[in-house]
């Protein structure tokens, strides 16, 4: 059976906006979770709240098939841990209790940090250099747990 409901966090960001457009073009029912109010758009069901609100997350993910986690704090250092790490942990915890078929976590190439290697792989040792990179790396470790 083909997936019908796709959820996107971080839909006001560059990757999230494009993800939403593509999912709508594919005929999916799209749900968007945003901290800030967004303008209503055809084909999108809006959920306002943050990644730490379990009640909203449960409603957001109810009967969903796909989740694209594009949200992340890139500017305000004091919010990075709560959004990028704690928010991801909360979202992932709720998602694991649903019937999602697909969970896509968007991270950052920056988690690798500085390297002299020409190519990086899954086995490359990560050495994040700043708070954003560190928090995105911590989030990667959370979602890679079984």
What are these regions (language model features)?
Residues 45-65:
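Conserved Rossmann-fold cofactor-binding substructure of NAD(P)-dependent oxidoreductases
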């Amino acid at each position: 059976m083909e997936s019908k409901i796709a959820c996107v966090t971080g839909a006001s960001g560059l990757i999230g906006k494009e993800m939403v457009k593509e999912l709508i073009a594919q005929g999916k029912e799209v749900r968007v979770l945003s901290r800030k109010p967004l303008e209503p758009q055809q084909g999108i069901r809006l959920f306002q709240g943050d990644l730490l609100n379990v009640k909203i997350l449960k409603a957001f993910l109810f009967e969903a098939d796909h989740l694209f986690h594009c949200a992340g704090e890139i500017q305000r250092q004091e919010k990075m841990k709560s959004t990028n790490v704690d928010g991801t942990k909360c979202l992932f915890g709720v998602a694991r209790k649903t019937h999602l078929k697909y969970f896509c976590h968007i991270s950052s190439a920056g988690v690798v940090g500085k390297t002299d290697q020409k190519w990086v792989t899954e086995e490359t040792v990560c050495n994040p250099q700043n708070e954003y990179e560190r928090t995105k790396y911590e989030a990667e470790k959370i979602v890679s747990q079984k």
